Amino acid sequence: MLLVLFPIAMGLGTFLESWYSTDAARIWVYNAWWFEALMLLLMVNFMGNIKKYNLLSREKLSVLILHLSFIFILLGAFVTRYIGDEGVMPIRENNISNSYLSEKTYLTVFIDGENEGVTERKTLKSQLLLSEHVNNDFIINENFYNKNFSISFDDFRENVTEGLVLDPSGERYIKLVEAVDGNRREHYIKEGQISSIQNILFSFNSYQKGAINITSEAGEYFIESPFDAQFTIMSTQQNGNLSKDVKQPLELRSLYQIPGFQFVFPEPALRGVFEIVDAEVTDREIEDALYLNLNYNGKTEKVALLGGRGYVNSPKSLTIDDLDFHLSYGSNEVQLPFSIQLNDFIAEKYPGTENSYSSFMSKVTVQDKETFDYDIFMNNILNYKGYRFFQ
């Protein structure tokens, strides 16, 4: 019966994952107590069968090996779940990293305040597994040197991003579009501020020496660049030059080109506010949003945190009376006792296809007291100091 229920449960999890999300399937099936109990009962039954059917005899060696295999598989699942840790280590070619981002997600809270005249900090870290398809309610009751506060769940949304929502009473923003590595990205430069985009400074109505300064005067827009550039008016394909340190009219919907960087200002400045909105399929930064209620000293503040698996975002800060709270949601950045350099990433495609890849391989260098090269690909795992790296 157990051998029938186990594959049925796994099949159910697969369907739930495709219908809803991976995290929903984990909450309902894979991480549920009943699924773990099912695996535990299976392991106990396999161990009991060894004695019951006298599988330790030479004649039944093949059956013994089969039973032991299942036992070790289930033990491995237990170790991975409760003792091991998983994560992702993103590295660009010719870069080095000594940390990875945890597969598990956490709510991290720093609380700053005074205790007997001395500034103190308390850290809270709570592992969360959330999905917008399940009931995520939780409440964290804590104190900061006998000052009680609580953090409670309000809402959770998947696949969102931060975007500009038009509002006549909002701040003015001008949109810039660039695609340095072939991926389209949109940036909004707030009026009166300076933004760093791909290590190039841009300002909007706030002159900054060494930046590409955009100004608006009586409904007209101007650009002044610290270096020479060219532009192409996309509607007419007419070319023009942008001279260094010369204030010129800004050509909207035109492609500006400087060495190693291309950008477009597609439209005039807009008034609006930045809010969490549903992400489009083409958006590069797709995150989750966790909404919380923070209650302290009889006052409640609502907090919206962007993050999720694979993200380590800056904390969102707020002050309630005499306590400062800094909250973030996402993965942990875990340090390794060694470094890995990615020398080359090789992706091979099936013949005659554009987006169907047949294999991947990473040529890396492990940097520690001893340094060595290694190729990571399918079925060729890098094992080093208790860590296993897969491609």
Regions found by a protein language model. Give the residues of each.
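Short hydrophobic alpha-helical segments that form membrane-spanning helices or hydrophobic packing faces
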Residues: 5-6, 38-42, 76, 387, ...
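N-terminal membrane topogenic signal
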Residues: 1-2
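N-terminal ordered "arm"
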Residues: 17, 69, 150-151
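Alpha-helical transmembrane segments of multi-pass membrane proteins
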Residues: 6-20
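Soluble non-transmembrane domains of integral membrane proteins
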Residues: 89-391
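Perimembrane loop-to-helix junctions flanking transmembrane segments
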Residues: 21-30
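Residue-level marker of motif borders
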Residues: 27, 62-64, 381
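Internal alpha-helical transmembrane segments
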Residues: 31-108, 112
